[in-house]
Amino acid sequence: MPDLIQTKSVVLGYGVKMVLAPAKAARSLLIREEAVWRFSLPRVLSTPTTMLETTEPIAHASELDKPSIVVTNTEVDSEDNTSSVLGRYIPQKCLQNARLAAVNSCVNEIFEARFRERPDAPAVCAWDGSYTYRELNDRSSALAHKLRRRGVQAEVLVALLFEKSKFSVVAMHAVIKAGGAFQLWDPSLPVARLGGMFAESKAHLVLASAANARLAAEISENVMVVDESLVPPWESAPLNPGTQPENALYCVFTSGSTGKPKGFLMDHRAFCTCALGVGELLGLNGASRLIQFSANSFDLATFDHILPFLCGACLCIPSEEERKGDLTRAFNRYRATHAVLTPTVSRLLEPEKLTTLQVLLLAGEAPSREDIRRWASTVGLLNGYSPAEAGCITIVNPSLQESHPSKIGFPVSVVPWVVDPDDCNRLVPAGEVGELVLQGHTLARGYFGRPDQSKAAFIPTPAWVRQFGYETYGRLYRTGDLVRFDAEDESLVYIGRKDSQVKIRGQRLELGEVEHALQQFFPRPQIVVVELLTAEDREPALVGFVYQPGSSQHMPAPPQHQDNSLFLVADDQFCADAQKALASLRDILPPYMIPSDLLRISHLPMVPSGKTDRRLIRMRAVDLAPEERRKYSSVLGQSRDQPVTQLEESLLGLWATCLKLPPSQIGVLDNFFHLGGGSLEAIHLAAEARNMGFAELSSAAVFQCPTIREMAGMLDGVTASVQEQDPRGCTSFQLESSLVAELLRKSQCTLEDLQEGFLPLTPFQEKTAKMKPMHLLLDIPGIDHSRLEAAWALVLEKHISFRSIYVEHQGRVYQAFLRQPDTVSIPIRWCDEPVHECAARFCEQDVDLILDGRPWWSMTRINNKIDSVLVLRLTHAQWDALTLDVLFKDFMAAYESRELSRRDLEFPAYMRFRLRHNASPATVRFWSTFLHGSRLTQPLLLDGAAEVDPGNEAMVFVSQQIPMLTPPHGITLGSVFRAAWAFVLARYTGQEDVVFGEFVEGRSLLVKSVEKVTGCAAAETPMRIVVSPTASVRDLLKHSQEQYVARIPYETCELEDIVPSSTSWPTDTTFNHILVIQHEPVLPPVALDGRPCPHRWAFHGRLEDVYVQMVFGPDTLHVGMSGPEIRLSRTIATQLVEKLASTITQFNDRPEALLSEITV
């Protein structure tokens, strides 16, 4: 065909210029054979569909009957034509509200502006405290100065390792103010993963909370712990970090296909450009309260932590317990107006019960129709989309109520190009499916140390960007997501992924990373494939498929494959291997990346190109009937144990609802997490359980008792995993033989004299053994003396603790237990004066400390002609309240020749078990966790100007009586007392996280008959309560009770043992004061032969400690303080007791009030 000569140029529309041009220069599309029309149009239009649509009218309008048309590239002639052509690829409506210009500002500059506008406005409202903008500014500035001295400046990266806390906000802003960049870490991630991210990002420093200090130390030697002492509340000197918009702001890691997470940096310009547009869409302003829920490993957590401060709003941070508990209640408690949640998390909320929520942005995964239905009439509902590399939220559907779930909406701050999935240099017309490429100033820089992956994802500018004049709108990122523009509203519609990236529970992951990790446990030639299975009737599940060539012939799947021959029955060996692999993955991958099941496949299906046919594997697995799935599963393959109680039946129904599984697929011994459950499902299960009256089943309990049988046991009060133990055979605790020999020498005893050998005293016993003895005086006029001696002989034979002796050696006191003598002799002293005066004088003289092996317990009868008093000398190291009750009931029974109570467990056996329990790793771990990051609260109890006389033995006693109270439902009066004292302490000291001592009975060990042991089981142990100023009274009461319950199994461990093993406190730390809850009376009414025998106590010397007491009377409560005058001012005690009594009453009467409304 001859070349043609250009004769004229005609603009035909859409930027098309019809020309005559050499045939070899044109891209030809044959329309007619006989003649050729040549015309040019931009390369962006050069797709077959576009050419057909554009050339068809030209061919019909031609004077030639049989033209042939050739398309070539050309430049767009005019701005109008450019817009017209662009509209063929990006609908005009799609871009009309996008903010494409860069915001050339830094986060610290915008925060400073908001602070100057409203310095006293609330900035942070967290479970552990609140800050105004001024307070946040001052504290973060103070920390920023310290960071600058530690080398933090522009482009220096700092890792943040915090639980949900106000301190994470301070740390984040401090890094930004110092000029550095941060990466927010989730402490629940495996330490190996955290260490890998630290190394790959070349982070300089780890800022950690006190609770995570030890974990941080495993990752880096350069650790700074952030707590109240490091962020003083006073204003710091201004700091000019010199940050530029192009400097790094934060680092994020996402899942990587090579087996390691991919990290990248986001700069200030990118974040500000993205965030300000989203903030405007959400309507965030000074009255807004955004609640922070996302896990720290999720990029949305970074978005949550910064966005409110750019808009003058308040960030609300619930605790981990609140996040995993009643989420609806937490939203209401913090008065949240805005939230950014995954649809999965939003399903845990009850929309009709939310009182303040106004705007909900769903992000991280696709919502369902049911999600839209639940929320559409309740709040302003939006959907957000964006890969982390392109900005936190770059595309938003602002009217999700009226949309299909797949519509992701319109761009906020990017240009959404849709390209040929196989060639990103070619655009596809609006309405056709293609890969989404995002262009804008919101993009990350690229991946750490991965130039090839960076080049593949952050692509060079294609020619069509320049042709449309869009080269000034930033760089481009290939999302890997397939989308199209909707024909009706011109919004973007999400179709699916083009690669191996998937999302589960809002987290994006590379299937290749999971496969890489799993392959280590099934070495080649075995082949591992991991896929995300989705079905309408259940939550998405990550499932692994293992092909073992030795088990079957390797063959591609035939097209007509319609049965289940793809799968092999899971034998015992495969099940064992699979369970071992899944358990090992928990050490190297986050929970959301661990497959819920492994299936064994008979062959590896392939497509004609030789690649694995993943689609076929997914289809076959999803189509498996439940009974078929059970045969092939490595975790579901065991036989199902059926419920045997009504409680187990009820729990099975709850599981089926939460896991979206038929009840027939669940057995009472199945593991909740092996059936596809995760932390969110655990929260859902706990919430559903509360609705059915199982308030004790928390999400934490789901992790502790992951089977139905264990849960039922826990709810019944007896777990399958923890049974009461019999300590009588516990002989593992022994002293060194040389020490025993020395104690025998000092006590002048032989082993034959002892029924039980030497044991150390508990700290409380030792403290009381070093005090002067106390005396109990019992009126016994007319009581037969021989019967009296015989009765006490029986009582002392049974109760070995009153045959104890004490020996001091090198500052420690040890106890041993004498054999019972054949007879008991009670001496009688006669006097002429009133018997009580004589008894009092006798007690005053009988005050020697006995730490040389002589018995403490002694009895003397003092008579005159009319009256008689039995004086019993004893030490609190021998008894507690329960002991005296049992002791005197046995005494009355013995005197009247009745049968004594059953002897179940003797005190020495109990003590050996207790000593072993207190030193156990579980006890050490509990106290390390319970007290981590805390400090003992030491309120000022003396007047500053008061002079202290060490010789002053005077005591202070202050008490106030209040009517007996009925506490709120589900709360004990003890919990009210603890919470009220914590509140008074917090107000008095300014320390919201308070720790004080508490006297406990010490009978919480899982030991048979522990309640019948006679001896001193009492202990003085720490109690920690956090008084959040934003909490309600009920929140604090519940927290107080939860702390008490959590401590119960470990309350026998006392401060002297806890400090060196579980804290970083000074080893000489002692309690400033001790809480005591006492139920009067300590002794039962004593009567012998029907004759009442009144009793009274005689105390000597001075108590060394300050006690805060609540004593239960018949119809009243007595609240008071007591202590030595050299340690407790009467004035201060009076003030504190008044505040305490008032607080107890207000807490009891106004449980729904906010703590800020309580006046003291």
UniProtKB/Swiss-Prot annotation:
Subcellular location: Cytoplasm
UniProt keyword Phosphoprotein present: yes
InterPro entries listed in its UniProt record: AA_adenyl_dom (IPR010071), ACP-like_sf (IPR036736), AMP-bd_C_sf (IPR045851), AMP-dep_synth/lig_dom (IPR000873), ANL_N_sf (IPR042099), CAT-like_dom_sf (IPR023213), Condensatn (IPR001242), PP-bd_ACP (IPR009081)
Positions where O-(pantetheine 4'-phosphoryl)serine occurs in the chain: 679
Alphabetically ordered keywords of this record: Cytoplasm, Ligase, Luminescence, Phosphopantetheine, Phosphoprotein, Photoprotein, Repeat, Virulence
Region of interest: Condensation: 749-1025
Function comment: Nonribosomal peptide synthetase; part of the gene cluster that mediates the biosynthesis of the antitumor fumiquinazolines that confer a dual-usage capability to defend against phagocytes in the environment and animal hosts. The simplest member is fumiquinazoline F (FQF) with a 6-6-6 tricyclic core derived from anthranilic acid (Ant), tryptophan (Trp), and alanine (Ala). The trimodular NRPS fmqA is responsible for FQF formation.
Name of the molecule in the record: Nonribosomal peptide synthetase fmqC
Annotated organism of origin: Aspergillus fumigatus (strain ATCC MYA-4609 / CBS 101355 / FGSC A1100 / Af293) (Neosartorya fumigata)
